[in-house]
From Swiss-Prot:
EC main group: ligase
Organism this protein belongs to: Arthrobacter sp. (strain FB24)
EC numbers for this chain: 6.2.1.5
A molecular function (GO) term: magnesium ion binding
Biological process annotations from GO: succinyl-CoA metabolic process; tricarboxylic acid cycle
Binding site for Mg(2+): 191, 205
Listed name of the protein: Succinate--CoA ligase [ADP-forming] subunit beta
Cofactor or coenzyme needed: Mg(2+)
Role played: Succinyl-CoA synthetase functions in the citric acid cycle (TCA), coupling the hydrolysis of succinyl-CoA to the synthesis of either ATP or GTP and thus represents the only step of substrate-level phosphorylation in the TCA. The beta subunit provides nucleotide specificity of the enzyme and binds the substrate succinate, while the binding sites for coenzyme A and phosphate are found in the alpha subunit.
Domain annotation ATP-grasp: ranges: 9-236
Phylogenetic placement of the source organism: Bacteria, Bacillati, Actinomycetota, Actinomycetes, Micrococcales
NCBIfam families found in the cross-reference section: PRK00696.1, sucCoAbeta
């Protein structure tokens, strides 16, 4: 779960990370009151879970409370990369002398943790990593040890901090590691981490991603979820325990097993190049259970996406045999009735495949087309989606 900046700021503060004052506001009037309470120069910052706020006009400096009112009036309701701004954070202005970068994240490729640090912050870190990779220090973190004082010292030295700053920055890094470890995060990022004119090290912006698999250890994490900010289809799928991610294409995807679903996305995208450049509309893994209830729930979510023009069901029968999957599809279509109004291409293989195909053939549903292979199914689904565009 990604946190809003103001939530990350509050979490940092709770773990002793130095931050400046910040108050969330949902209306221009609340923004003005917050600016008056903080006093002096403030920054009005759009609260959306996406980057590029500054370039989109979602971050503005306010020298007075009236300016904070004006800026928040313009920012609230703004669309930033498809995300509507429903709240802003009024942040205390900072006297910035230098900007740095720090993050610690789960390194899935190497089954490890990774700390990244640079004395050049404030810019897109991806751009820095490409243009000047030597400016971004990367230090592997042993999960069994974490970031202790020795490792924090190693990180700041590798990043090239001046000797007189290393102790201060290392102290902040230790506290950020405390956030990462104790909150079960998969990402903690500060960009920029700044040195103020007074020489203090302060986290001026923050990004935190929490591991939802660890929610059972953190009752308070449920309170951080903003259902209004979630994609409605993803929220609907989550309520039904479906592993669903919405994408931007036209071909709905249902499969069993994350690996098979990801392969299906690739094959559909490739097939779409020959059919109007249609693309996958979602990732949906129904796992090992393909009952009528699960299939109906999955189809209900996918068919609720107005962008979807066809659906490709790609299942390899294992523990759940293909005949059970076929019965689930037939039952799902019957349960959904008129709301099932888009063509389905179904490819079955594996355990009891012949019986599964027989069940679908006998059902003879007008929306269902059987495919013998994944390539054939992807091509047909892309063709149908393109025809319906």
């Amino acid at each position: 779960m990604d946190l809003f900046e103001y939530q990350a700021r509050d979490m940092f503060e709770a773990h002793g990370v130095p931050v400046l004052a910040g108050i969330v506001a949902h209306t221009p009037e609340e923004a003005k009151a917050a600016a008056e309470k903080i006093g002096g120069v403030t920054v009005v910052k759009a609260q959306v879970k996406v980057g590029g706020r500054g370039k989109a006009g979602g971050v503005k400096v306010a020298k007075t409370a009236d300016e904070a009112l004006e800026h928040s009036t313009n920012i609230l309701g703004m669309d930033i990369k498809g995300h509507t701004v429903n709240k802003v954070m009024i942040a205390q202005g900072a006297d910035i002398a230098e900007e740095y970068y720090f993050s610690v994240l789960l390194d899935r490729a190497n089954r490890n943790y990774l700390a990244m640090c640079s004395v050049e912050g404030g810019m897109e870190i991806e751009q820095l990593a490409v243009e000047r990779p030597d400016a971004l220090a990367k230090v592997a973190i042993d999960p069994a040890v974490g970031i202790d004082q020795a490792k924090a010292d190693e990180i700041v030295a590798a990043a090239g901090f001046a000797e007189e700053l290393r102790g201060k920055v290392a102290d902040v890094i230790l506290k950020l590691w405390d956030v990462f470890k104790k909150e079960d995060a998969t990402l903690v990022e500060v960009n920029p981490l700044v040195k103020t004119g007074a020489g203090d090290i302060v986290a001026l912006d923050g990004k935190v991603t929490l591991d939802e698999n660890a929610d059972f250890r953190h009752a308070k994490h449920a309170l951080l979820e903003d259902k209004d900010a979630a994609d409605p289809l993803e929220a609907k799928a989550k309520a039904q325990d479906l592993n669903y991610v919405k994408l931007d294409g036209e071909v709905g995807i249902i499969g069993n097993g994350a690996g098979l679903v990801m392969s299906t996305l690739d094959v559909v995208a490739y097939a779409g190049e020959n059919h109007g450049n249609v693309k996958p509309a979602n990732f949906l893994d129904i796992g090992g259970g393909a009952s009528a209830e699960v299939m109906a729930a999955g189809l209900d979510v996918i068919l609720g996406d107005e962008q979807v023009k066809s659906v490709f069901v790609n299942v390899f029968g294992g523990i759940t045999a293909c005949d059970a999957v076929a019965k689930g599809i037939v039952g799902a279509l019957a349960e959904l009735g008129h709301s099932a109004n888009k063509p389905l291409v179904v490819r079955l293989d594996g355990n009891n495949v012949e019986e599964g195909r027989r069940i679908l053939a006998e059902a003879n549903h007008p929306l269902v087309t059987l495919a013998a292979t994944m390539d054939e199914g992807a091509d047909k689904a892309a063709e149908l989606a393109n025809a319906a565009k």
